[in-house]
Amino acid sequence: MRKIASIVEMQRLATQWRRRGIKISFVPTMGYLHDGHLSLVREALKRVGRNGKVVVSIYVNPTQFGPMEDFSKYPRDLKRDLKLCAEAGVDVAFCPGDAEMYPSGGKRSVASPYQSRGTDEAVPSTGFSTYVVEERLSQLMEGASRPTHFRGVTTVVAKLFNLVQPDVAVFG
């Protein structure tokens, strides 16, 4: 199994696979893998067959945490996650850092959604002002109490899809 942290390297590899007609299955995660994640990997392997490739992303996305949500305490164990991925037959563990995914240097955005609320930002600011927003479903259930959560999720998933270019994505 190969660990990739660079967006450019992930894009190059995905492009090589696609040019050779290799199917790519993708399992996006925030790491700290468990049996549920591994069942998603097994499904991903089935979906592309033995000639396909499986990419698992391991990235704790700061944009899906709101104020007063403890981004810094989200559990992480990359060494264990990589071992589990290798044992499960994953081809690539894509593990970008925040500087790769949001390369703004951590500058606070003038349009920060937290500034208007008068709260302190509990997660690293990305400095970005462009996001992918789903306006109907994100207002229900968890979205009702976490107003920026799904904006962060939809944005990072769109970015990951553009990088990995999967034929299949498996979510749990």
Model regions and ranges:
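Nucleotidyltransferase catalytic core that binds NTPs
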Residues: M1-G172
